[in-house]
Amino acid sequence: MEIQFGNQRCRMVNSGGFLATDGSHLKEMETDDVLVEFLNIEHQLFIRNIRAIVKIADTTVLPSASDKKLLYYVFDETRVRINDTPVIFSKLEEDNANVNEGSKMGVMTVPNTPQKPNLQQQKFEAINANEDQIDYSSNLEQNYNSLIRQGSDQVIPLSRFASEKSALELEKELFSERIPESQSAAEPVLKVENSENDLDEKLVLDGQHVEGDHSSDTEEEVVSEDQKQLNKTDDESTFIESHQIYIQGETKSPSSVSQSLSGDPSLKPAEVFDRKQSAEINSPIEKDVNPQQNISDSSIKNNSIHSDEVNPEVRPDLTPSNENEESKRSAPEIALKEKESTSQDESNREAEEAPISTNYSFPSSSLEDQPDKNVQSSAVENKNKHTNLVTSSFNLTKPMKSFIRRNGLRVQESVTDETDFVILGSPPLRRTHKFLLATSLGIPLVSSQYLTDCIKSGKVLDFRSYKYKDEEAEAKWGFRLDDIHRRTCFNGKRLYITKAIRDSMVGDSIHGLYSILETSGAEIVGDIKRAQEKDTIILAQPDNDQEGRNMSATGLNVYKIELVALSILRDRIDFDEFLIDYDADSPTKVIGKRNVSKASRTGQGRKRSSRSSWNKPSAKEQRT
C-alpha cells in the first residue's frame, strides 16, 4: 500500500509503520515526533498510536494514551486528514497477492475497533437499549414500539466515533413507500405533502404504523381510514396527546394531565405521567426531528386535542405576554434548541475524556478555527484547575500514575511555558533535553521523592519544598540548581552548526538542540555566508570536522558544542573556555581541502630512493 502525505509519497510494508513529523518516513523507530502508526492487516488499514489531530471522514479521533492504543479502522475511499494535511491511500498489486497468501495460511484475524465493533454484541446492545419499560395496553402503542424494535434490528449502531442511523431515518427507509399517495382532503390530523419529511412527521405525530401496501387503495378505503382516525379510543387519544404535548414544547405536571383527561376514569395521574416520561425517553423526536421541516402552526394546533385546555396555573412563571410566545413555538425550534444543548454536552464530555498523558504540540490552526473569547477564558480556567508536570530520567510507577489521575495532575510529554515543575531522577544529574529546556524557561526542578511523599500523605503537597539537589554537578559545571529564572544569555545571538555535528547527532537530538536554542532566544542560521558575519557563534567538533578547520584557518572563532548547555546553566557565555584551537591540537595546517605538513612542503627529511636521478647512468655510459 502506498501513502501520500501532503506532497510526499512512501510505500508501506505489509505490517505497517510510523509516520514522523519530518516527512513520510515509515518503518522507523517510535520517537516523540511520530504522528500516527499504520497497521496493514489482511488488506485492511488501521490507525493507532495517535499523537496528532486525525480526522477520519468528518469525525475527529482523540489521541491515544500511552498505556492504551486503540485501533481505528479506515474504510476504503475514506477522507483522512492528519494535522489538517490530507492523506491518500493507494492499493498496489502486491497487496492483493499478500492478502491471498495470508488468507490461505490463516495467520491473522481482523481485531475489533471502535469503528468496527463486534456485530453480535452491538446487535444485542441495540435490542436491550430499545426494550419496552412499560407494558402498554393499547394496540396503537404496541404498533408504535414495534416500529422502533423493527428499526433496531435493521441498524447496527456504531461507536461515538462514527455516525449512526436514527430511528426516524430508518422509518423513512422502511415505511415511506407504504404510505398511500392519495389522502382525503378532509383529513383532520395533518396536511400531507409529497415530501418525505412531512410523511415522516405524520407518522410520528399520529403515532400509527401503517401496515401493508396501500398504493392501490380506493377512495372508500381512505375515507374509512379517516373516519377511524376520528373515532379513536380513549387510550389511543391519550397516547397521541402525550406526544403532541411534548412536540409543542409544553410541560405539564401530573395533576394538569389528569385534569385534561378527567373524562377517562380508568387512567390515573401517575400512569399518565409515567407514560409521558417513557414517551420522552423512547421517542426519536427529541434528537432526530429535522429542524428544516416546515410544519405550520395550524396543523399542530389541529393535531392537538387538548392544547387549549392547558391549566395556566401549571406554569406560574409565564406572564400573559410570554405565554403567547411560548404557545407559538414550533416543534423544529424546540428540537433545534435541544440539539444544540446536546451537542454542547457531547463536546464537554469529549474534552473530559482526553487522555491525561497526551500533550503533544501541533501546528497552529487557521484563523477560522481560532476559539472565541469564551472558549479562551474557559481554557484559562481549566489550566488553573490542573498542575502540569514533566518527568526527566525518571519513570512513573502505577501507584504514581493513579495518584496523578485522581488528584487532577497532568503529565506532559515535553516542557512548555505551561509546565509547573519538572521531576528529575536520582543523582547523578544528566543534561537531558527536558532538563535544559526547564532551566532555560526558569521552571522549578523537583526531586522524585515528592510523589512518594504525596502518596503516603494522600494529598498533593507543595512541590517547592522538594527542590532537586546535586552538589557534585553544581561544582563540576559551575552553576546553582536553586537559581531558577529565565535564561537570557542567547537573546539575539546567531549560531551556525557545522555539518559534522549535525551528522553525529542521532534521531531527534539535532531537533532537540534547535528547540533549546530557539527557546533561549537564539537564531539558527544555515547559510555558510551568514556564518562568516560578525558576532555569529560557530559550533564545531575538535576532531574530524573539516568544515570547522577551514573556518578556523580563515580567522573565524570556532567553539565546542558544550558551550550551549553550560551557558544555559550559568546564564553567561564563556567563549574562551570553549574555543577550539586546531593549530595547538595538530601540527598540520589547512590548505584548501588537504592537510599538508611543513616538512612535506619544504622537502626536508625526505628519504632518497634508489630511483633518484643521480643514481641513473647516463646515455653515454650505457653505450660504452
Swiss-Prot record:
Any single Gene Ontology cellular-component annotation: cytoplasm
Native species: Schizosaccharomyces pombe (strain 972 / ATCC 24843) (Fission yeast)
GO BP annotations listed: mitotic G2 DNA damage checkpoint signaling
Compositional bias segments (type: Polar residues): 250-263, 356-386
This protein's UniProt keywords: Cell cycle, Chromosome, Cytoplasm, Cytoskeleton, DNA damage, Nucleus, Phosphoprotein
Record-listed Phosphoserine modification sites: S253, S283
Protein encoded by which gene: mdb1
InterPro entries in alphabetical order: BRCT_dom, BRCT_dom_sf, DDR_Transcriptional_Reg
Transmembrane segment boundaries: none
Entry protein name: DNA damage response protein Mdb1
Domain spans labelled BRCT: 376-468
Gene3D superfamilies: BRCT domain (3.40.50.10190)
